[in-house]
């Protein structure tokens, strides 16, 4: 994957894989701080994030600052060798600011103000909020910008987690300004929005409000523009702090912590404004295959900055506190989930939080140091993990090797998930993206993320589960990739509308018509509880939710056909040779086994391997530098797995090789019956992990269940 074109990002000032978590010393008396330092050293903690929610403590009255306690704890951390991910403390406003300016409080779509008492109680468009955010950030930067422990700046916290959209009067003013910048004049807006439907023509900018609750369906282009505007409004808020920090501390890296695959903010835009991508990841312990979705999240995180390492800035040591049922993590789960993030390109394992709270909304959220103190299971397991990470220092700075990318396009996500005016509410963008990635995971591949316009350098296969909104530029980029020998697979309901939600001339697939060699006559949603069947490769696969009546153009091969229902006998899956590559179209929502079958064939056409036998709990990801491949092999399941791995590989965790004796952490490492010097068998016990170092090869090692292997 190519680097981002924004120049060389500033480096985080820490010379190790970062390990630690959020730290809230202002929730504890100072006599606890010394104990924290002792236990942090014992656990191997080398970085903490603070003071994320401490604005009220730092500025208890307007213009009156109390820096003394923060001075003391920052110095104490530095004295103990712990780097500081220093937050700007702008995650939530102090009560005095809200009471002085109640117009700052956000408003929901029903016109109700959200009150003080939780967090993120602000309208992102509020001029007062923006002015105060800039002021507080400058105060923090001027006081601590030269602190020797400062590793990077942490701006705000989880933008949009509670308030990603605001419908208040100040948001309306900002929305109008955004629309004026986009369309120039009312004629441009009226044309883009298609206002002749239902008599919605605007004759004054002041007539345009945020899309509050209305008697019926709201104009879908207005809704789409409000999604874009809301993401941009939050980005502007972020950029205000970035600009202040660039001015005062130009050499210090800046970040804001993302929330994995988060619908409400276009992270491509946010990542371009920061130095390093950071993520808060909370796979559900109650979901036995949550690691599969996590892999897609992490693929996005590493891709947002062109493949550069990212940082896992928050995760849970066990249970969270915000699900309906907060299931704890089983013993060993902390380790395998944390090392999965490292496998996928993270140069950090951080938790929320260091010491478990005694009060407040998160007192039942697990932490590194649980309520029982150093005897707690979470502390013992995270301490062991901290020491284990030191054995993996060689992987720091390396990059994940992937030959496959999945198109992540926020416009299509927003447009295809509007609550009304679509053929079906069941065709969920995120659910389809996760299903396609899950199939590729089963077949043995880690998947990057990419924009629909690329760059596609280094990839053999690009999959686009849905590109509802598509333009000629995207089509040209994908066509050039295929012409040069790439394989692209595009999913249903793609190429339907342009960026103003107007249906393309001639219908779907719009700009992809020539590339795919098909035309969609009609979308054909499947009613709840029903499923069509699709015949593919001699097997029948269920197709719930969605189908399409398509016509193939000359030169297009029918790979699979509908086998039941009203579409029986019509094409369902097609491919077309274009230049040196091929373009596939999947017109239906296939069951998991159907997707595996189709994508297995697409992989073969792209010259990529695929596992013959699949196990959803097996994962293998390779990070590499110029000389060495570091292949992480993970068993996310509760029963042992035996896999085929390169013979003579050095396990960074155990220090052994594939010819060594059994090791209790991983089970047996024994030679297989394969030809000498080729492959060995490795048994991974429950939640087992191996990190195998081998000389860098032209292709990353492809790990399969034993005795299966590729020649």
List PLM regions with ranges.
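Short, well-ordered coil/turn segments that N-cap beta-strands
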Residues: 14-17, 44-46, 78-84, 146-151, ...
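The substrate-binding groove and active-site-proximal loops of carbohydrate-active enzymes
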Residues: 18-29, 53-68, 115-134, 159-163, ...
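Polysaccharide-binding and catalytic clefts of secreted carbohydrate-active enzymes
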Residues: 110, 114-276, 280-294
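Aromatic-lined substrate-binding rim segments of carbohydrate-active enzymes
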Residues: 35-41, 49-113, 141, 241-248, ...
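N-terminal carbohydrate-binding accessory modules
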Residues: 1-49, 60, 75-79, 83, ...
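Carbohydrate-binding surfaces of carbohydrate-active enzymes
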Residues: 205-208, 260, 271, 279-711
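Conserved, mostly hydrophobic/aromatic
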Residues: 21, 40, 48, 77, ...
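Short, acidic/polar
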Residues: 27-42, 133-139, 259-270, 330-338
């Amino acid at each position: 994957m190519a680097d981002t074109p924004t120049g060389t990002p500033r480096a985080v000032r820490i010379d190790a894989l970062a390990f630690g978590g959020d730290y809230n010393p202002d929730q504890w008396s100072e006599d606890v701080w010394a104990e924290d330092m002792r236990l942090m050293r014992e656990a191997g903690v080398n970085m903490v994030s603070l003071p994320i929610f401490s604005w009220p403590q730092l500025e208890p009255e307007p213009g009156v600052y109390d820096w003394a306690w923060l001075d003391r704890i920052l110095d104490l951390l530095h004295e103990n060798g712990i780097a500081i991910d220093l937050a700007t403390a702008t995650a939530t406003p102090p009560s005095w600011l809200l009471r002085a300016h109640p117009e700052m409080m956000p408003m929901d779509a029903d016109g109700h103000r959200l009150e003080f008492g939780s967090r993120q109680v602000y309208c992102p468009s509020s001029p007062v909020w923006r002015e105060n955010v800039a002021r507080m950030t400058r105060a923090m930067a001027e006081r601590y910008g030269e602190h020797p422990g400062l590793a990077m700046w942490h701006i705000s916290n989880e933008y949009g987690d509670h308030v990603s959209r605001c419908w208040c009067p100040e948001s309306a003013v900002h929305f109008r300004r955004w629309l004026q910048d986009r369309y120039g004049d009312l004629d441009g807006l009226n044309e883009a929005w298609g206002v002749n439907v239902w008599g919605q023509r605007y004759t004054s900018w002041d007539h345009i409000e945020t899309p509050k609750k209305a008697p019926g369906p709201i104009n879908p282009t207005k809704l789409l523009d409000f999604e874009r505007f809301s993401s941009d409004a939050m980005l502007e808020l972020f950029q205000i702090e970035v600009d202040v920090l660039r001015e005062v501390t130009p050499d210090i890296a800046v970040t804001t912590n993302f929330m994995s695959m988060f619908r409400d903010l276009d992270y491509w835009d946010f990542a371009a404004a920061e130095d390093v991508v950071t993520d808060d990841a909370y796979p559900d312990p109650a979901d036995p295959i949550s690691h599969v979705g996590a892999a897609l999240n992490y693929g996005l995180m590493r891709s947002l900055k062109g493949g550069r390492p990212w940082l896992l800035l928050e995760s849970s040591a066990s249970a969270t506190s915000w699900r309906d049922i907060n299931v704890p993590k089983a013993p060993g789960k902390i380790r395998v989930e944390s090392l999965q993030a490292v496998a996928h390109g993270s140069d950090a394992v951080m938790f929320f939080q260091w010491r478990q709270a005694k009060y407040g909304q998160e007192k039942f959220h697990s932490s590194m140091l649980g309520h029982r103190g150093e005897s707690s299971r979470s502390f013992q397991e995270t301490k062991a993990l901290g020491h284990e990470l030191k054995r993996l220092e060689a992987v720091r700075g390396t990059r994940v090797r992937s030959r496959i990318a999945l198109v992540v396009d926020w416009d299509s996500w927003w447009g295809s998930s509007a609550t009304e005016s679509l053929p079906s509410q069941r065709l969920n963008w995120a659910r389809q993206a996760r299903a396609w990635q899950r199939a590729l995971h089963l077949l043995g591949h880690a998947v990057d993320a990419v924009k629909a316009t690329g760059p596609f350098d280094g990839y053999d296969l690009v999959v686009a589960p849905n590109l509802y909104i598509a333009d000629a530029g995207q089509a040209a980029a994908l066509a050039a990739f295929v012409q040069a020998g790439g394989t692209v697979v595009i999913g249903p309901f793609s190429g339907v509308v342009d960026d103003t939600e107007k249906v393309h001339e001639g219908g779907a697939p719009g700009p992809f018509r020539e590339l795919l060699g098909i035309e969609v006559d009609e979308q054909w949603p499947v009613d709840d509880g029903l499923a069509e069947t699709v015949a593919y490769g001699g097997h029948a696969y269920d197709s719930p939710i969605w189908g399409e009546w398509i016509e193939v153009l000359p030169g297009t091969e029918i790979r699979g056909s509908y086998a039941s229902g009203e579409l029986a006998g019509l094409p369902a899956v097609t491919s077309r040779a274009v230049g040196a590559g091929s373009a596939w179209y999947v017109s239906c929502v296939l069951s998991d086994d159907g997707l595996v079958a189709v994508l297995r064939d697409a992989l073969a056409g792209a010259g990529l391997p695929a596992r013959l036998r699949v196990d959803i709990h097996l994962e293998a990801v390779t990070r590499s530098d110029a000389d060495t491949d570091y292949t992480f092999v993970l068993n996310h399941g509760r029963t042992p797995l035996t896999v085929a791995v390169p013979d003579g590989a050095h396990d960074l965790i155990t220090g052994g090789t594939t010819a060594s004796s059994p090791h209790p952490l991983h089970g047996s490492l024994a030679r297989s019956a394969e030809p000498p010097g080729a492959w060995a068998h490795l048994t991974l016990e429950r939640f087992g992990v191996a990190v195998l170092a081998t000389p860098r090869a032209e292709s990353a090692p492809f790990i399969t269940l034993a005795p299966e292997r590729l020649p």
